[in-house]
UniProtKB/Swiss-Prot annotation:
Source organism, top-level taxon: Bacteria
Protein name per the record: Transaldolase
Record-level Gene Ontology MF annotations: transaldolase activity
Record field: catalytic activity: D-sedoheptulose 7-phosphate + D-glyceraldehyde 3-phosphate = D-erythrose 4-phosphate + beta-D-fructose 6-phosphate
Length: 318
């Protein structure tokens, strides 16, 4: 009998949530995702030193301003790591726009264009890239314009149905609803423990998946941010799941039988009219968990981006 991970691959596209190339080689996912926290972690791996050096030298050649060099080096490093990962995975890499642009539509679009240009200069076509943006109203609007240009997007830090609905209505290629972080909030708020089937994060992704399929939306649902394999098993059949190395290892070492839980409906019905900005903001604001976790996620990604920039600034000064 195939291990649990191999069983999963027959019904759900498995994506590696890591910048660790060795882990990606080990588990052979279809795609990979990165974020500022994972880039910061990857930058401390000795085998990546040459990627950092390349980013530093490139940044120095682009500007005399140290602030601009730091920004350029960060962008180039993210792309360098993405290029290395794409030598292994057959599918796509998700590369994230600076979290500090989460409420800046124009800035997000400009940064996305820059990342796509850097990938193109490295010989990577945009068809293999997903631009990650936070699921703010501004991020969703930026993604809508980018999608119309043929640049596919991955809307991340998604915690609510309102965010998911707005993403689908904007024609976003893929969303990443965060399962584990939703569970974290409810456990802290209620003091309760949840079985995998009752897990609020699992329930949220299931609702989003069913809504998309029932109304014929093509946006891919990729569950993310898992705390345990039970959550993953309950989402068998989801379009994609992005999983960190530790849980990929657990699945690879398990013989648990995988039974498909999410099944697309055969009947498609028309959806309601798209949310207006006012409706989106009200519905999102009505979910205190989503409001708190989105704000926290943006802050934490920005903090790690700042830590990475401190490291790069030190190297640029050498």
């Amino acid at each position: 009998m195939p291990n649990t991970l191999e069983q999963f691959k027959s019904i759900t596209t498995i994506v590696a949530d890591t910048g660790d190339i060795e882990a990606i080689k080990r588990y052979q996912p279809e795609d990979a995702t990165t974020n500022p926290s994972l880039i910061l972690k990857a930058a401390q791996i000795p085998d990546y030193a040459h990627l950092i050096e390349n980013a530093i030298e490139w940044a120095k050649s682009q500007s005399d301003s140290i602030e601009q060099q730091v920004e350029d080096a960060g962008d180039k490093l993210a792309v360098n790591i993405g290029v290395e990962i794409l030598k292994i995975v057959p599918g796509r890499i998700s590369t994230e726009v600076d979290a500090r642009l989460s409420f800046d539509k124009a800035g997000s679009i400009t940064k996305a264009h820059k990342l796509i240009k850097l990938y193109k200069e490295a010989g990577i076509d945009k068809s293999r890239i997903l631009i990650k943006l936070a699921s703010t109203w501004e991020g969703i609007c930026a993604a809508k314009e980018l999608e119309q240009e043929g640049i596919n997007c991955n809307l991340t830090l998604l915690f609510s149905f309102a965010q998911a609905r707005a993403c689908a209505e904007a024609g976003v290629y893929l969303i990443s609803p965060f399962v584990g972080r939703i569970l974290d909030w409810y456990k802290k708020d209620t003091g309760l423990e949840y079985s995998s089937v009752e897990d609020p994060g699992v329930v949220s992704v299931t609702e989003i998946y069913n809504y998309y399929k029932r109304h014929g939306f093509n946006t891919v649902v990729m569950g993310a941010s898992f705390r345990n394999t039970g959550e993953i098993i309950e989402l068998a059949g989801c379009d994609r799941l992005t999983i960190g190395p530790a849980l990929l290892e657990e699945l690879a070492n398990s013989q648990t039988e995988v039974v498909r839980k999410l099944i697309p409906t055969e009947t498609v019905v028309d959806a309601a009219d798209p949310l207006t900005e006012a409706q989106f903001r009200w519905e999102f604001n009505e979910d205190p968990m989503a409001v708190e976790k989105l704000a926290e996620g943006i802050r934490n990604f920005a903090i790690d981006q700042g830590k990475l920039e401190v490291m790069l600034k030190e190297k640029l000064a050498c």
